[in-house]
Amino acid sequence: MVELKVKTEMDVDRNLCNYCGACVGMCPTDAIWLDETVIKIHEEKCIECGFCIVGCPTGAITAEWFHGNL
């Protein structure tokens, strides 16, 4: 049986992000990396654990699929 998983895009609010890198350190699959001016999320590597969302001190990362706290 094939399992299909629909992924929705994660959003990083550039006005809230202070580029501290906390999300990078929280990601267990190295799906997030920090450029000098941009947080990049590799959607194919993301396992939707929510660690980056909860670990962000400014609340800059959001996703439609994430509701609640870890």
Swiss-Prot record:
Residues bound to [4Fe-4S] cluster 1: C17, C20, C23, C56
Cofactor: [4Fe-4S] cluster
Keyword terms: 4Fe-4S, Electron transport, Iron, Iron-sulfur, Metal-binding, Repeat, Transport
InterPro entries from the UniProt entry: 4Fe4S_Fe-S-bd (IPR017896), 4Fe4S_Fe_S_CS (IPR017900), Fe-S_Ferredoxin (IPR050572)
Gene Ontology MF annotations: 4 iron, 4 sulfur cluster binding; metal ion binding; oxidoreductase activity
Gene3D superfamilies (UniProt xref): 3.30.70.20, 3.30.70.3270
Residues annotated to bind [4Fe-4S] cluster 2: C27, C46, C49, C52
Paired cysteines (S-S): none
Record-annotated 4Fe-4S ferredoxin-type domain positions: 8-36, 37-66
Cofactor note: Binds 2 [4Fe-4S] clusters.
Pfam family membership, one: Fer4
Function field: Ferredoxins are iron-sulfur proteins that transfer electrons in a wide variety of metabolic reactions.
PANTHER family, per database record: ADENYLYLSULFATE REDUCTASE, BETA SUBUNIT, L-ASPARTATE SEMIALDEHYDE SULFURTRANSFERASE IRON-SULFUR SUBUNIT
Name of this protein: Probable ferredoxin TA0517
Species this protein is from: Thermoplasma acidophilum (strain ATCC 25905 / DSM 1728 / JCM 9062 / NBRC 15155 / AMRC-C165)
Taxonomic lineage: Archaea, Methanobacteriati, Thermoplasmatota, Thermoplasmata, Thermoplasmatales
